[in-house]
Amino acid sequence: MKILLTGAGGMVGKNILAHTKSKDYEFITPSSKELDLLEKKHITTYLKHHKPNFIIHAAGIVGGIHANINNPVKFLVENMQMGINLLTAAKDNNIRKLLNLGSSCMYPKDCDSGLTEDMILTGELESTNEGYALAKITSAKLCEYINREDSEFQYKTAIPCNLYGKYDKFDENNSHMIPAVIKKIVTAIETGKSEVEIWGDGEARREFMYAEDLADFIFYTINNFTKMPQNINVGLGQDYTITEYYKVIAKILGYKGTFVYDKSKPVGMRRKLIDNTLLSEFGWSNKVDLESGISKTCQYFLNEKNND
C-alpha cells in the first residue's frame, strides 16, 4: 500500500515513520516545500503523479496556548485551507481512503468530561484556541459530507487527546504543555531557581497521550479501516491536574524546588477528558503509561540539548 503522509516532519508524522510497522508500507512524505497544502493545484498535480492508495492528514499549524492566542488568523485560515484543499483534491483524484487527524479542542468548552464524538458542534468552543478548533471541525465535517455524497469514499477522523513525546517542540512560548514544562524545569535546575511558575491554580485537568501510542493506533486503523467509526476519540480515558504533571516531570528530572501559581494567567478549559467507549469497541488501547512516556520524553530532550 502506498500512503501519502502530510506533516511528516511534525511530531506525529515522525512517530509514525519511526514505528516498527512503518516498513510494511510505502510512505510518501513530502515536505511543505514539495507539497504546498495551501495551493490546491499543487496537491492535484502531486496526487496525479504519485497515486497514493491511502492518505493520512497529519499536517497543521499547531502550538500551545501562547501561540493560539497570539496567532488566531493563521491558526484558522491556514489549517482550514489545508484541510479543504487536501480533502477535495483527494476526492477529485478518486483516492478512496483518508484518515484525518482532528483534535479534542473540537469539543464544546462546557462539556468537561466524558466527551463523546456526537458532542461536536453542540456548544461554544474554548476561546483560546477557537480558530484551530473551527478548522479541525470543518475538516471532520467535510469528511462526513464526502462519504455521504458517495459511499465509495471512506474519509474518517481520529480525535486524539493532547499529545507529547519524542520530536515535539520544546519552546516555552510555542509548544504544548508537557515539553514546555520539561524545558522550564530543566532551565530552573541549570540556573538554580528555587521556584517554578504555573499558570492558573494548577487544578485544571488534562489528558495527555504519548505520541508513539497514536502512531500505534494509526497502524491498527490502517488494517481495520472499514470498521473504524466516522469519528473516533483516541486517548487514555484518564486525566491529571496541571500540578500533577509538573510534579511527575520534576520527580523524573530531580528538581527539588517549589511551584508558585499565577492565577491571573489564562488556563483554557478546566477539564477536557474524552470518552473512549468507541475506541474500546474498535479494539485498541494505549500501551505507554504517563511516567514512562514522560521519562522517555525528558531523555529525548536532554539528548537533543546535549547534541546542539
UniProtKB/Swiss-Prot annotation:
Substrate binds at K184, W199, R206. It catalyses: GDP-beta-L-colitose + NAD(+) = GDP-4-dehydro-3,6-dideoxy-alpha-D-mannose + NADH + H(+); GDP-beta-L-colitose + NADP(+) = GDP-4-dehydro-3,6-dideoxy-alpha-D-mannose + NADPH + H(+). Its EC number is 1.1.1.356. It is an enzyme of class 1 (oxidoreductase). One of its GO terms (biological process) is 'de novo' GDP-L-fucose biosynthetic process. InterPro entries: Epimerase_deHydtase (IPR001509), GDP_fucose/colitose_synth (IPR028614), NAD(P)-bd_dom_sf (IPR036291). The active site is at Y132 (proton donor/acceptor). NADP(+) binds at residues 7-13, 101-104, 136, 160-163, 176. Keywords: Isomerase, NAD, NADP, Oxidoreductase. The record marks S103, C105 as: Important for catalytic activity. Pathway: Nucleotide-sugar metabolism; GDP-L-colitose biosynthesis. One of its GO terms (molecular function) is GDP-L-fucose synthase activity. Belongs to the NAD(P)-dependent epimerase/dehydratase family. Fucose synthase subfamily. Homodimer. This is GDP-L-colitose synthase. It comes from Yersinia pseudotuberculosis.
